[in-house]
Amino acid sequence: MSKVIGIDLGTTNSCVAVLEGGEPKVIANPEGNRTTPSVVAFKNGETQVGEVAKRQAITNPNTIISIKRHMGTDYKENIEGKEYSPQEISAMILQNLKATAESYLGEKVTKAVITVPAYFNDAERQATKDAGKIAGLEVERIINEPTAAALAYGLDKTDKEQKVLVFDLGGGTFDVSILELGDGVFEVLSTSGDNKLGGDDFDQVIIDYLVEEFKKENGLDLSQDKMAMQRLKDAAEKAKKDLSGVSSTQISLPFISAGEAGPLHLEVTLSRAKFEELSHTLVERTMGPTRQAMKDAGLSNADIDEVILVGGSTRIPAVQEAIKKELGKEPNKGVNPDEVVAMGAAIQGGVITGDVKDVVLLDVTPLSLGIETMGGVSTVLIERNTTIPTSKSQVFSTAADNQPAVDIHVLQGERQMAADNKTLGRFQLTDIPPAPRGVPQIEVTFDIDKNGIVNVTAKDLGTQKEQKITIQSSSSLSDEEIDRMVKDAEANAEADKKRREEVDLRNEADQLVFATDKAIKDLEDKVDAAEKEKAEAAKEELKKALEGNDLEEIKAKKDTLNEIVQGLSMKLYEQMAQAQQGAEGAASQDDDVVDADFTEVKDDDNK
């Protein structure tokens, strides 16, 4: 089998690796660097990728950076009169990495394992797979970045069981995953993250500070000057990196602008203390998902054996200090944060080709999946942090008599009401044979494959007719939405609970009205007319209460009607028991027992 390369398709930088002699090896690009900037530039019809594109970004407005932040959305880049989707731009980066691997291996490469942030949703994963396809790669597997990092870290440590926290702060995304390693099994226990937080944001606080300082001194706003801003971005990124090793750095940008008196220069000394003050809220934002992942895994700080740092931004001293303070543990510095993800992807490639044996990877889905049911409730079929691949089925029914079709509204998120979650897709199961409500059996099955991509099937168990949907990128979750869902779910837990209770109460009351009608019809002349009238009156009172918003009244009327219906049922049961004693002799001669409505049979008819 041909080699399966491992690709870390990053927001700021990308990396490619391959398995050689059972060990992952990072492949250097033609410039001799082991990572390639995720930058694409267009100039006079020519496309440039990587270092060469980044170098001319200052003078070329047709330069695209951080495209990963737009994956899974309908965002478009308009360049030289042509529109490009994020998938197409990402494909150009992938093609560059593919060419690097082919040059090193001396053979054509067609297969790859590509990594994505653990908190990437279905649309973003689909978009990544599409980018691979555009680049001429068969994407054998999409795996989560923290999981890939753990794979690279733990490949030679499978002899002992340990729990590992992977803290992955990249250029544009942030993930925390907790894994259990042992006997070659890499099992993800929980994952959390923020898809709008990364090294770019740390650069931005320095840029904002420099713009402000220059404005104070010269009265000019550099944020309106595109070329000046590109120079500031480069300087900010360099200063951020410098401050990981020194306590102070000089930012010097001559001829950044011009005033009435001539050229203006930017000269600022930035201390590490000032940078930490500017980026304090960003560092604090990384702690929320860290605590959430620990809570979801049900672990305390003492349970964590190792903390692995992934992504260049984890080199920031304040980030390392915050992790140490939060978890009470010194992070492991034995892995290269820029390369470890690609190395893990290469190992997964080796697992696929059979070159790596006795390694099993068990990943999880980051958000709950379900469908909308009666009353606008979100009924979860697959909980978040469920190990994938997985499949889950549940049987539902119709809400009205002779209902010919059901709408399946597929949802992703943590809220209790459908309207508060993200719509992944909708489809319809039609041609349901006429039947009373509650009789048809509709089986809904959710299937998540090893790449975290969702398929939903609805099947009428009566007719065996089924309808399927594969969730497509068009219904994508934006980067902000996925993080907002979990936060909203926590903030609105109490309100959600009350709304859910109200819907449940109304559904129960509605069901009781339906059951009462059926019971009165079934009883016919078997009980007193007065008792039937009493049940009818209580039913009408409940229906009237349901038209209003007084939940206490609905509950009281429901309880009253429930008591009456139970009383009627008891009387009917007693009558049936007496009749059964009379028919016992005849019934005992029949060996076949059939569950059915009881019908009194006269002895004469049986002779």
UniProtKB/Swiss-Prot annotation:
Gene3D superfamilies in UniProt: 1.20.1270.10, 3.30.420.40, Actin, Chain A, domain 4 (3.90.640.10), Substrate Binding Domain Of DNAk, Chain A, domain 1 (2.60.34.10)
InterPro entries: ATPase_NBD, Chaperone_DnaK, Heat_shock_70_CS, HSP70_C_sf, HSP70_peptide-bd_sf, Hsp_70_fam
Listed Acidic residues bias regions: 589-598
Pfam entry (one): HSP70
Keywords: ATP-binding, Chaperone, Nucleotide-binding, Phosphoprotein, Stress response
SUPFAM superfamilies the record matches: Actin-like ATPase domain (SSF53067), Heat shock protein 70kD (HSP70), C-terminal subdomain (SSF100934), Heat shock protein 70kD (HSP70), peptide-binding domain (SSF100920)
Chain spans, region Disordered: 577-607
The keyword Cell membrane belongs to this UniProt entry's keyword annotation: no
Biased composition (Low complexity): 577-588
Modified residues (Phosphothreonine): 173
This protein's record includes keyword Chaperone: yes
Known role: Acts as a chaperone.
Family: Belongs to the heat shock protein 70 family.
Name listed for the protein in its UniProt record: Chaperone protein DnaK
Top-level taxonomy: Bacteria, Bacillati, Bacillota, Bacilli, Bacillales
Name of encoding gene: dnaK
